[in-house]
């Protein structure tokens, strides 16, 4: 009987794992990501049409925020250097959206059933948030500034709160570098990817 219960428990774990979307095998190559995850490409293009944020900018955000992991959360803080404590924020999922900001997104867009662990919803969220900068005069390819505003909020960005956070500036520089890399890759496969949408 115990053996049966153990086998049943393992089966449940395997089922749960199989339902979780795995990160792409080649996270450094945008073309390979989209060829592997066709539904992701479709979601990103849909977000671009709605919010005007390019795929390579959006995907550079996802890479930085969650490494393409659906259930990503901030590491727990530790007491005395080793005792697990609370997480520093309510961020969850591909976009690492905070609970309050996610609720604002759902209210404003009407996407009331949106989940932070769903890639399409997360792609739409990032486009929604970044578009606020685009309509305020940010260049839509300026991943660095858009990311700083994504992290600090647009009010914080205007106040230049990021200037006191050298670590954040370095992260934003990495996001820009990845966006530029993704952009060059995307230009080489965009035509084929768009043709593939016909068969999805």
Please place each PLM-identified region on the residue numbering.
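Catalytic glycan-binding domains that act on GlcNAc-containing polysaccharides
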Residues: 20-194
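C-terminal motif of bacterial Sec signal peptides marking the signal peptidase cleavage site
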Residues: 16-18
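Sec-dependent N-terminal signal peptides
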Residues: 6-14
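Conserved small/polar residues in nucleotide/adenosyl-binding loops
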Residues: 198-200
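Positively charged n-region of N-terminal signal peptides that target proteins for export
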Residues: 1-5
